[in-house]
Amino acid sequence: MSNSLLTQPTQESVQQIFARIAPQYDDLNTFLSFGQHHIWKAMAVKWSGVSPGDRLLDVCCGSGDLAFQGAKVVGTRGKVVGLDFCAELLAIAAGKHKSKYAHLPMQWLQGDALALPFSDNEFDGATMGYGLRNVGNIPQALTELQRVLKPGKKVAILDFHQPGNALAANFQRWYLANVVVPMAKQWRLTEEYAYLQPSLDRFPTGPKQVQFALEVGFAKAVHYPIAAGLMGVLVAEK
């Protein structure tokens, strides 16, 4: 993998990266988040505003952890649709669904976050976990989320955040470079995870994400820093 690919990967190369890391994806997510990602994902589901019986869309669903959190809330009368561009991660999600959550109505689709295969005004809520940073066009991804939501409904988008505090920012950079990447080396995935810091450097700040959301048609948008500012959740209402 070239240095240029690490700093500005194409969507095809990002898809290939996730295909390669799929077998270790859950373990590395737990390590990346200090074991807290399940809590943050539950917070995102709560901020999405869904309730029992609702239809929830989880975009960039990966191995399904955020979708499963949503399925527990919407229950057997509702439905969760998980969409991702990586077939390998979707297979893991489907396997977990079958073994642990078979009683909950869920559907897994391979698709593009920039061209969602759904009708306008179809969902009661939407979530996205650690996906917005990896799409090729953030405003277009937000446009599609706004389109498929019913009027008055919300999307909650969890991702890394660039801390305003210099100490937290330095810790985040040190942790990625000196803990996460060396751990990934154990699975021979050093280059795959080395793209994390460049992707974070390119990722819009919370206020910029809010601006994008409002520009594409959301009526309201707020960005909440969490985990000492190391993570953030963008909540936008149609």
Curated annotation (Swiss-Prot):
Keywords noted in UniProt: Methyltransferase, S-adenosyl-L-methionine, Transferase
The EC number(s) this enzyme carries: 2.1.1.329
PROSITE patterns: SAM_MT_UBIE (PS51608), UBIE_1 (PS01183)
Pathway(s): Cofactor biosynthesis; phylloquinone biosynthesis
InterPro entries, per database record: MenG (IPR032904), SAM-dependent_MTases_sf (IPR029063), UbiE/COQ5_MeTrFase (IPR004033), UbiE/COQ5_MeTrFase_CS (IPR023576)
Catalyzed chemical reaction(s): demethylphylloquinol + S-adenosyl-L-methionine = phylloquinol + S-adenosyl-L-homocysteine + H(+)
Statement: the UniProt record of this protein carries the keyword Repressor: no
GO molecular function, one term: methyltransferase activity
UniProt xrefs under SUPFAM superfamilies: S-adenosyl-L-methionine-dependent methyltransferases (SSF53335)
Pfam families documented for this protein: Ubie_methyltran
Similarity field: Belongs to the class I-like SAM-binding methyltransferase superfamily. MenG/UbiE family.
Function: Methyltransferase required for the conversion of 2-phytyl-1,4-beta-naphthoquinol to phylloquinol.
HAMAP family: MenG_phylloquinone_subfam, MenG_UbiE_methyltr
Protein name: 2-phytyl-1,4-naphtoquinone methyltransferase
Organism: Synechocystis sp. (strain ATCC 27184 / PCC 6803 / Kazusa)
Designated gene of the protein: menG
